[in-house]
Amino acid sequence: MNINLTLIGQAIAFAFFVAFCMKFVWPPLINAISERQRKIADGLNAAEKAKADLADAQAQVKQELDAAKAQAAQLIEQANRRAAQLIEEARTQAAAEGERIRQQAKEAVDQEINSAREELRQQVAALVVTGAEKILNQQVDAEAHNAMLSQLAAKL
């Protein structure tokens, strides 16, 4: 056997094998590798986008949380102001009611004083009439002297 002829035969077989692999085996492998690279790149891009979206969502959540806290603080402040206003209104109403009750009591006391004075005047007038009857030993007509007794009672 000749080594040169074997070597040439092997080289030709190897060339056919390489041509066959380049024609039928290599393109699917390159496509699979390209597809895998594309999927990995897409996955990395999606991960970066998801990371950016997560950061945006966290910023938005923080912003909404801050807004909710501010709104809650505003509502609490508004409720406190309303409570203070209601307390002040209740104080004003209580003061007005107290003043009204005091005024009614004063009017009732004044009325009682006037009633007592009038009753006292009538009693004094009756005593004066009785005293005058005893002094004069005669009956004094109360209706005839009513004006005089009224003047006397008014002076008392």
From Swiss-Prot:
Statement: the UniProt record of this protein carries the keyword Ion transport: yes
Primary localization class, coarse: membrane
A single GO cellular-component term on record: plasma membrane
Record's keyword annotation contains Protease: no
Record GO terms (molecular function): proton-transporting ATP synthase activity, rotational mechanism; proton-transporting ATPase activity, rotational mechanism
UniProt superkingdom: Bacteria
Reported function: F(1)F(0) ATP synthase produces ATP from ADP in the presence of a proton or sodium gradient. F-type ATPases consist of two structural domains, F(1) containing the extramembraneous catalytic core and F(0) containing the membrane proton channel, linked together by a central stalk and a peripheral stalk. During catalysis, ATP synthesis in the catalytic domain of F(1) is coupled via a rotary mechanism of the central stalk subunits to proton translocation.
Quaternary structure and interacting proteins, as annotated: F-type ATPases have 2 components, F(1) - the catalytic core - and F(0) - the membrane proton channel. F(1) has five subunits: alpha(3), beta(3), gamma(1), delta(1), epsilon(1). F(0) has three main subunits: a(1), b(2) and c(10-14). The alpha and beta chains form an alternating ring which encloses part of the gamma chain. F(1) is attached to F(0) by a central stalk formed by the gamma and epsilon chains, while a peripheral stalk is formed by the delta and b chains.
HAMAP family for this protein: ATP_synth_b_bprime
Name of the protein this chain belongs to: ATP synthase subunit b
Species annotation: Acinetobacter baumannii (strain SDF)
